[in-house]
Every structure is written in C-alpha cells, then in structure tokens.
C-alpha cells in the first residue's frame, strides 16, 4: 500500500472523528438545552411558589394589622364609653348632692326667716321697753335725751383730755429727763475741760496821769489838743474832777484802744500838740493793726485751726476789740470753739470741723457796723468769700436761726454758743433791757385766761403764775404752761432758759362756832 492509501485512510478517519465529535457535541448541547429548560421550569415554578407564598404572607400580615387596628379602635371606644359612663355617674351624683344642698338651704332659709321674725319681735319689744325706760329716766333725772348725751360726752371729753394731758406730761417728763441727762453729761464733760477766764468788757477806759497838771496840757490852748485827739480817734475824752485820771469813752473798742495807746505815748513823751498828736495816733493805729493780726494768729494756734485765709485771721483779731453784752467776742469765739470740739468728740462727730465753725461763728461781728444785716448772715458770706466749705458757711449762718442747719456741727455750735453766753458772769445787759424783758415776761403770762397774778423772779429766769382754781383745772394748767413756753420762745430773746411755773391752789375755809 502506497502513501496515498494511508492518506485517504487518515482523512476518512479524521472525517469519522469529526462526525463523531459533532454528534457528541450536538448530543451534549441537546442535553444541556434540556437541562436548561428543566432548570428554567424549575426556577419558574419556584418563583411562582415564592410569589404565592409572599402574597399569602402579605395578605396574612394585612389581615393581622387590620385585626390589630380593629382591636385598638374597639378598645378606645370601650374606654371612651367607660369614661362617658363615669362622667354621667359623677354628674348624677353632683346633681343629687346639689338637690340635697338646695333642700338644706331652703330649710335653713326657712329657719332663718323664723328667727328673723322672732328677732324683729324681740327688737320691737326692746324698743318699746327702751322708750318706756327713757321716758322714766327723763322724768326721774329731769334731763332730756340730748341733754343727757351732752352731759355724758362732756364727762368723757374731760376724762380723755385729762388722761391725754397726763400722758403727754409723762412722755415729756421722761423724754426731758433722758435728754437732760445725756445733755448734762456731754455739756458737763465739755465745760470741765474748757476753763475760760475772762471778765466783761466796758465802753470806757481810764488812763492814769502822773499829775493833775497833765490835764491842762492834754486840753491845750483853747482846747486844741483835746479836739485834735477826739477828731483823729473818734473817742470822747472826759476830764472831770477825778484826780490824776482821764476817761476815754467810745463804743468802738478799736478806736478806744488807739486813743489809749496814743494818749499814753503822748504822756510819756511830754510833747503834746496837734502835730505830735497826729503822729502818735498813726503809730497807735499801726500797733493796733499788728496786735490784731497777732491776736488772730494766737486764736488759731490756741484752738488748733489751720488753713484760714489771712483776711479771716485779721477779722478774728478784730474780734478782740468787740464785745457782746460786755463779753469779749474773740474770747467768746475761742470758748465756743473749745466747747463745740469737746461736745463733738463726746458724740463721735468730727471735732476739727466743729471747732472751726465755733471759732468763726461770730466773724460777722468784726464788720457788722460796716455792712447791713444780721451778723450770722454777714459771717456766712465772709466765710464763703474766703472759700470755706459749704458746711462751715451754713453752720455760721445758722447759729442764730437765720438759716436752716444742715449738719450736726451747726447744731453743736448753736449749743456751745448758748452755753458760753449763758455762763454766769459771761454777759451783762443794760438795766433798761433787763426791765423790759421782765415786763414782757409778765405781760405774756397775764394775757392768758384764768391768770390771777404772775411774778418774774430769779433775774428773769423763772416766771411764777398764780391761776384761778375755779377757771382752770390741772389739765388746763399743763396746757397753759406749754402755750406760755411756746410764746416766750417765739417773742423773747434771752440767755439760757426760762422756767415757767404754773401754780393752782384751792383752799377750803370753814369756821367752827
């Protein structure tokens, strides 16, 4: 066999193999297709079964949800029905209770009406009895109802008035005792620490002469020397029979001091003529000015007050030559400063401010003859001008009541001023003013109704008033004393205090026969 044979055999075999392979492949493809169809049918059946199951499950869940909703609605309806039934029962109970209360109220109203009727019957009976009793009382007493009411009211009024007066008296006495006790403690302590020793000033000064011949030289030829001296100083020279003495008379202490110094220098010098007199008067004025400044500085040093304007110091020095009722004003101011400071310390108030006001309180008297107005107001304006504080300005202006005090220091200075002025021997007043004050005191007392007589005693520091017992009772005496005190305080000016003593005396006299 040749190669061609083998090739043909090989080709045939290959063809057979290809055919067999195609058959096998086709068979496998058919098998796979059949299996795929089966799988598709199986999956479809499973999907249909799942869908049916889910459908049934959804239907079941919907039925269950509907059942739950129906049960919830039924439960809520049941609860609402129960609530409505409960409210209905409560309303029924309340209606029953209201019916019972209404019935009880009707019963009470009926009972009250019966009681009201009984009360009206009793009142009518009582009114009838009262009218009978009133008629019987009027017949027995001889007084009408209005007269009896008036009598009773008058008795009650007198009793209340008496009790009120007694109560007021007790309160006033207690308050006065407490206030006096504390005031005495403060003032006594202040006074015992402040020893002021000065005498009353006068309006005249006596200059001693070496011999009586000097009188003629002072008078000079045709009186030229004495006229020159009087003209330059403004002081009257009184030359009388008094041996070896010349009297200088003048109300201005500064002028009087200038005249005294000039005259004493002229006497020592021995040369007395108008030109020399003029020279000595000028020297005396300069000496007095220096003395004024020194006195002001000494006053501030003595009281411990610093920072005063130089003009205020000069005005303080001028107060040495001023008097008030014979009391030296500068020494009085120093005394008031010490007293105010001591009382302020006792009361826990700033003593420095109180002392400052006390020292300056009468500063207006240094210029009051040059400026019109009360010295307190003048002093406050001066203090304001030289830049003192508002409290100092107010306290100076208020120490005599010309201004309303705005600080405790102002009130303390008022008290210290009164203490210094009222100290025995500190001041004096003219006989005429003293007599007028006593007459005015008795006049105020005699103007009151029921006064029989009055006497001003103790140098005008006490007024004793005898009243008619048939006109005034004890309560009226208390009221009279209070009214007289108010009138004295408003109409009189006086140092210290005045005691008003109202005396009511009843005497019963019988004779045994």
Curated annotation (Swiss-Prot):
* Source species, domain of life: Bacteria
Show the PROSITE patterns listed in the entry.
Answer: HD, KH_TYPE_1
Q: Do you know which PANTHER family this protein is assigned to?
A: RIBONUCLEASE Y
Q: The HD domain covers which part of the protein?
A: 329-422
- Enzyme Commission (EC) number: 3.1.-.-
User: What region holds the KH domain?
Assistant: 203-288
Q: Which family does it belong to?
A: Belongs to the RNase Y family.
Organism the protein comes from: Clostridium botulinum (strain Langeland / NCTC 10281 / Type F)
- The answer on whether this UniProt entry bears the keyword Cell membrane reads yes
Query: Mind telling me what this protein is named?
Result: Ribonuclease Y
Function, as annotated, reads: Endoribonuclease that initiates mRNA decay.
Where are its TM segments located?
6-26
